[in-house]
Amino acid sequence: MSIEKVPILGKETIHVGYGIQDHIVTEVVDNLASSTYVIVTDTNVEKTPQFSKLTNDFTKVLNEKRPDSRVLTYSVPPGENNKNRATKAAVEDFLLQQGCTRDTVIIAVGGGVIGDMIGFVAATFMRGVRVVQVPTTLLAMVDSSVGGKTAIDTPLGKNFIGAFHQPQYVFIDVSYLESLPTRQFINGMAEVVKTAAIWNEEEFTRLENFSKQFLSVVTAKNPDLLSIKEELVKTVLESVRVKAEVVSSDEKESSLRNLLNFGHTIGHAIEAIVTPEALHGECVSIGMIKEAELARYLGILPPVAVARLSKCLVAYGLPVTIDDKLFLQRVGPKRHNIEIDLLLKKMSIDKKNDGSKIRSVILESIGKCYQLKAHEVSKQDLTFVLTDEVLVHPFKQPPQENVITPPGSKSISNRALILAALGTGTVRIKNLLHSDDTKHMLAAVAALKGAEITTEDNGETIVLKGNGGDLVTCDEELYLGNAGTASRFLTTVASLVGKSESNDHVVLTGNARMQERPIGPLVDALRSNGSEVQYLNKEGSLPLKITAGNGLKGGRIELAATISSQYVSSILMCAPYAKEPVTLALVGGKPISQLYIDMTCAMMKSFGIEVTKSTTEDYTYHIPKGTYKNPAEYVIESDASSATYPLAFAAMTGTSCTVPNIGSSSLQGDARFAVDVLKPMGCKVEQTATSTTVTGPPRGQLKPLPHVDMEPMTDAFLTASVVAAVAQGDSSTTITGIANQRVKECNRIEAMITELAKFGVKADELPDGIEIHGIDIADLKTPSIEKRGVCSYDDHRVAMSFSLLSGLCKEPVLILERSTTGKTWPGWWDILHSKFNIELDGYEPPFGTDKEGTKASDKSIIIIGMRGTGKSTLSEWLASFMGFKSLDMDVYLEEKLGNDIKSLIKEKGWEYFREQEAAIAKECFSKFSKGYVLSTGGGIVEGAENRQRLKDYITAGGIVLHLHRDLEETVSFLSVDTTRPAYTSEVKEVWLRREQWYDDCSNYHFYSSHCNTEEEFDHLRKSFVNFIKIITGTEKASIPSGRSAALSLTVPDLNAISSQLGDIAVGAEAVELRVDLLKETSSSFIADQIAVIRKHIDLPIIYTVRTESQGGKFPDNKVEELRNLLLLGVKLGVAFIDVELTAPVEVIEEIIIKKGYTRVIASYNDIAGKLGWSNVEWTNKYNQGVSINADIVKLIGRASSLQDNLELEVFRKQNTLKPLLAVNLGSQGKLSQVLNTIFTPITQESLPNEDGLLTIKEINQIYFDIGGLTAKKFWVIGSPIQHSRSPNLHNAAYKALNLPFTFDRFESTDADQVYKELINKPDFGGLAITMPLKLDIMKYATELSDAAQKIGAVNTLVPLEGGYLGDNTDWVGITSSFTRAGVPPNPRVNGLVIGAGGTSRAAIYALHQIGCEKIYLANRTTSKLNEIKDSFPKEYNLEVLETEDQAEKAQNVGLAVSCVPADKPLDESLLQKVEKILANGEKSSNGFKSTLLEASYKPRVTPMMKIADEKFKWRAIPGVEMLVNQGDRQFQIHTGFTAPYDVIHRAVVEE
C-alpha cells in the first residue's frame, strides 16, 4: 500500500493512496485520542463496500486499542439541497442527544456536501471540535476537503455561512472512486483541470494526453480503475499539491488563495441558477471558459490558450458553453433562467468580492495567473463575455496607427491537417488557426485514428504524427457544426477509411445550416468512382453515411466545380490514395476560385506529391499514386480573408493599419484585397512580399469602385461591400465574380443586401454579384435594436464585416450571434476592443425574443387546406400583416404550364396534374423560402412526396398553417364554384380522406367562422391577425402587471351562448376554455369552440384540459389523448396553455419544447383540500413550475377556514420568482380569490359554477369592503362640457365592474381652480381634459408620457406617488378606431392628416405608431403645418401639401384623419387637395379598404365623411368611435382595470 503525504500549513496531514482504509483507521485511532468518534456520511455512501469496511475496521480497532471509546454513525440525506441550516441542526441535535463533548472527533465521509457541512458542524459544535475529512468523490478529493473551508448554503447563494476550520487529516482513498457514477467522476475533473491551468503547465499537458484513456475507462459499462490506477492517483495528487501549496501561503483567502476560484466567479453564478440539475464542476467548466475569454478580451490571454483550455475540458466530457447539448438536456427549461441580470446579481454577492465590486481570476497563460491575484472586472466586460449579442459603439478615437496579426489561414490550416493526417512522419504545424472549424477537423482526424496529435509551446504548435492514410471508422457521428471546409474535405477522406471491428461506415453531420449547404457535386463524383455515399436527410446535403472499405478506384473523375473549389481540393488531396492514378477533370465551365485550387496543389507539393495540369484538356489535373511525406515543420500563413477587416477599418476611419505577415507572395487570393479594392477606392497601400499597410483617406472621402471582379477573392466581397456602403461619388460600386457566395454559411449576397438596407444603404443583386449605392457617413441609419439589429446568419464574415460599418453609425448597433466569428477569428471582438479601442457592450434580448435573429416571420409561411376555406383571402391578409408577397401556387402552376388547371386535368388527367403540383411545390418551397405566403392547392397533401416535404418544412422551423371552416359551408361554396375541376368524389369523402393528412402536415390550425357582413369580416381579420401574432412571435400575450381576472367558460358547447359571450366576459382580461367540460373533444369541435370565442371576444384564450385527479372531467388514464389535446391547443395558437404539473414528465417536456410563442401556465390543484399552505409540497409544486420556466404558476387549494386564506397570502409573499395565481376554492376561500392579482378565476351568474367562484362584481365589492379599493372621484374638465359623453362612458364601466368610483363634469377654464378644487383633494382619482385646458394643466404634471410630449398636450391626468402623470389617449382613440374597422397592423400605406388644430398632432403621432412610412399634411393655410412638421422628429417623414399638384402626386395614401371643424363649411381649396388624394385611395389600400376617420363626433355623419364614403368609396369612421376608443384607454390609465368595451360603446353611441 503506497501512501503519498502532502504538506499543508507545515504539517503532512494530507494522505493520498489507493485502498487505504486500514491506514485511515490506524492513523486516527493512534494519533487522535477521543472518547467519541462520530462517522457522518450520506445515505448513498452508506451503502458502499468501502464505507462498510471503514466502519467495521474502526469498531474492531477501537475495541482493541481504545476499549473505553465509542464510535457513532449518522447519515444525512444526499445532495446540495440538503446542505442547509436544517440538516446541520439535525446533526448537532444528534451529537447533543448522544452526549458528545469537546473531545469528540468527527469523521466526515462523503462528497463535497458532507465535507463542507460536517466541517462546519465541527467548527461550531462546542466552539470547535476536531474533524477528519475522508472525501469519496473526485471533486471533494481535489477541492473541498483540502484547505479548511467549511460552509452551508442559504436561499441567496452557496456557502454564505461557514468558517475556516482545518481538518486534522485529509485521507484521500482513490479506491472510493470505484463506486462513483460516471457523471460525478467527470464533474470532478473540472477542478483538476483548473488547478493545472492556474499553476502547472506541465501537469496540464499530461492531463491533455490522459483525457482519452480516462474517458474510455470511466464511461465503460464496468469501469476498471485499476487499469489507470497510477495515472489516476497522480491526477489527484498533483491537483492536491497545487491547492495545498496555495493554502499554505494564504490560509484565510486574503490574496493568493483567490486563484483557486478561477472559473468560479461565473461558474458559481450559473450553478446558483441551475442547481441541482447541473453539477458544480459542469458549471465551473463553463465558468473557466468564460473567464478565459474575459482574459483574452482584455488582451492578456492568447487565443490559443483559450482554445487549448476548451479542448481539454471537452476531452474530459465537460461542457464549455451554456448551450452545450448535454448541459441543456440536464438543466432543461432552467436554461431560460440564466439571464445576464441574474448572473451579475449572483456574482455581485460572491464572497471574494470587494464590497459589490466583482472580482475574477485572470489567466495569463496555461499554468500562470495574471499578477497572482483576483482582479476587479467591470460589469460591462462581463456582460460582453456572457452574451452572444454585441452592441458596437461609434468609433470615436481609434489609434492612428496599428499593427494587427490575424490568426492562421482557415483554408491553409484545414488543408495542412488533412495532408499531415494522410502523410507519414511527424510535422510541427505552427500558427494553426485555433477555431471552431479546425477544432472540428482535429477532432475528426483523431476520431478516425488518422494521426497522433499533441501540442508544444503552450499549445502554439500542433505536433501531428500521421498514419499514412491508414484510417478506421469510429462509432460516433462526426459532428462538424457549420464547418463547410471540414465537411467537404472529410467527405472524400471518409471514402478512404477502413472498417473497424464495431462499425462499417462513417457518418458526417452538422448543424441546421450545414444540413442546407450543398455537397451534391462532390458526392456524385465520389459515387461515380466507387464510393458508397448515402444522404440521411435532405438530398444534396449533410448528414452523409459513407460506407467504409470501398476506397477510390482512381482513373478519370469528372467534377462540377462551378459552385465550390473545395470539392476540387477535397478530391485532389485524397487522390494519391486511390487504387489507380487519378485524372480529375473539372466540367461545367470555368471553376470557381481557381487560386484556392492552386493553393491546394502547392501545398500537396510541400508534402511530397506533385500535381500536373493537363496540356491537352482545360481544367484537368493528373495526380499520381503515393503517400505524403510530412515536413519537419509547416508554418501556416495568416488568413488573408481575415486580414481584410483590420485593413478595411483603416480605410473607413482614415487611420493606418499594417498586417505584417501577408503580402504579394501569399498563396491566398484575398491578399490582393488592399491593392485591387482599397487602393482604387482612395486608400494609400504599401505592400511588400510579406506585409501590407493601408492608410485610409479622411473619414467620408472613400470613392466608389465602378467595377471589380472579385472571383480570385470571393470571401472578401463582404468586406468590400461595407466599405462601398460609405463610398460616395458619381457611380455605385459593382462587384462581380462572387456567385459561389450564395452557398456559403448563408446566401451572403442576399444577406448583404438585406442588412445594408437596415443602414439605409441600397444594394442590388446581380447574376454573379452585387451593386452597392454608397451614401454619406452622416446619412447612415442605425439599425433598430427593437427589430433585432443586424443578423449575422451564423456567418463569421457577415458578423465581422458589419462590425466595421456599425461603428460609423451615430448610435450603438446590435449584432447578433457574435460568437460565430470563432470559425476564423475567435478573438476578433477582443482585437476591436483592445487594439482599436472600440467600446463594446454585451446585449441580452428581452425574454421571449427569438435569439436567432432570423425571426419566424422571415421564413415563408405555407398555407394548406380544402378548396373554399378562405386560403386566398386569409393569405392576402397574412401577407399584408407580415409584409410578405403572396403567391398562389395553383396560379403559379397555370402560368408556368400555360394552361388552366381545369383544362389541364381534362386533357392529361389527375395523375399528371399531381406530378406537376409536386414539382411546383419543390420549386416554390426552395425558390420562395423567405418573405412569401405560399397558398397551396387543396390536394397538395394527396401525394406522399408533398406530405414529406411539408413535414420537412416544419422540422426546419417553418410554419405550415392549415385553414379550415365549417364543412357544410365549404360544400355549399364548392357546389357553385365552376372555376376549378370537379372533385372525383363527394366533398365530404375528400375531406375525410385528407383530414389526417392536413393534421400531420401542419403545425398550426386556424378555423374561420362563416362571415355574412362586412363587420364580421373585419372581426375575422382582426382575430386572424391576433392568431398570426402569436404563432410568429410578433407579439406574445402579455402577463398583466395589475389586478386581472380570467373568465372560466364551463359550458359544453359555446355555440349555445355565443351571442351572450361579449356580456358574459365583462371584467375579464382573458377567457379560459375548459376543454374537459366540452361535450366532445374532437379536434374539429375544439377548433370550432376556439373560433366562437375569437368571433365574439377580443381576449387572450387560456386553454385548459383539467384531469379528474385535478378536479376536472378528463380521464387520468388517457395520457396519449391528453398529450394530443395539449398539442392541439398549441396548434390552434392560443395565448396561454394550462399544463398540469401532475402530467407525465415526457408530456410536460414536449409541450415546453413545442409551445412556440404560446405562454405556459403550470397548474396544480388540491381539490380535496388535503394540503395546508404551510405544507412544503406547495413550495415543491411552485418550484417545479419555475423549473420548467412556466410563465405563470397556478396553485389551487380548498379552504376550510379563514386561516387557510391567511396562510396562502404568506405563501404568496414568499414565492415571487414567477407570477403566481393562487386561490382557495369553496365558500371559505372567497378572501383568497379577492386578494389574488393575476388572472383570478371568475364566473358569471349565467354559467355553471361548481367551484364557488365569484363574479367580478362580487370580487370588487369585497375588495372595497376590506379596504383594497378606495372611493375615488374622476372628472372631465374644460369648457364647454355640458354635452361631454365622458361621464356616460366611465360611469357605465364603473357600474358594470362594481367599482366605487364616480365620474362627473367640472366646467372651468382655469387650471389653478381645477388644481385647488379637484386635484388637491384626497379622493382625487383622475381627469379627462378637454379644451381649453389641455396645455394649461400640463404644469401640474410631474411626468409626461411620450405621447403627451410629442403631441404637446394632455387629455388625461392621474396621481402618481409624489406627483401626477400627464398622458394623451387621443392617439389611441385614432389607432384603435382604425384597427377595429379592419385596418391591419403595419398596413404599409401612407397617411393623411387634414387640419392643423390640436387633434392633428395626435393624428400624426397615431399614424406614425400604426406604421405609416410617410404622413401628408393638408390644411387651408400651410404656415401652421410647417410649425407642426418642424416640431416632430425627422423619422416621422412629414410632408406639407401646399398645392393641388403636390396633393395629386401624393402616393399610396390609405389612411386619413380629418381634424377640421365639422360644424363649418369645408374650405374649397382644402377640399380640392383632399379630393385629389382620396381619388387615388382605391389603388392605395394594401389589402384593406382605404379608411378615413372623422375626429369630430358631432354630427354623426360629417361632410368630410360623406365625401369620402359616397364620392370616393372610402370607409368612413364616425368620430364617436374615436371618443369611445380614447375613453377605453383613459379608463385603463385611470383605474388599472380593462374597460368592458361593449358596455362603454353602448353608453356613448346609444345615448
UniProtKB/Swiss-Prot annotation:
Region (Shikimate dehydrogenase): 1271-1551
Catalytic activity: 7-phospho-2-dehydro-3-deoxy-D-arabino-heptonate = 3-dehydroquinate + phosphate; 3-dehydroquinate = 3-dehydroshikimate + H2O; shikimate + NADP(+) = 3-dehydroshikimate + NADPH + H(+); shikimate + ATP = 3-phosphoshikimate + ADP + H(+)
CDD domains associated with the record: DHQase_I, DHQS, EPSP_synthase, NAD_bind_Shikimate_DH, SK
Listed GO CC annotations: cytoplasm
Location in the cell: Cytoplasm
Record has Protein biosynthesis as a keyword: no
Binding-site residues for 7-phospho-2-dehydro-3-deoxy-D-arabino-heptonate, renumbered to this chain: 127, 143, 149, 159, 191-194, 243, 257-261, 264, 280, 351
Similarity field: In the N-terminal section; belongs to the sugar phosphate cyclases superfamily. Dehydroquinate synthase family.
Function: The AROM polypeptide catalyzes 5 consecutive enzymatic reactions in prechorismate polyaromatic amino acid biosynthesis.
Official protein name in the record: Pentafunctional AROM polypeptide
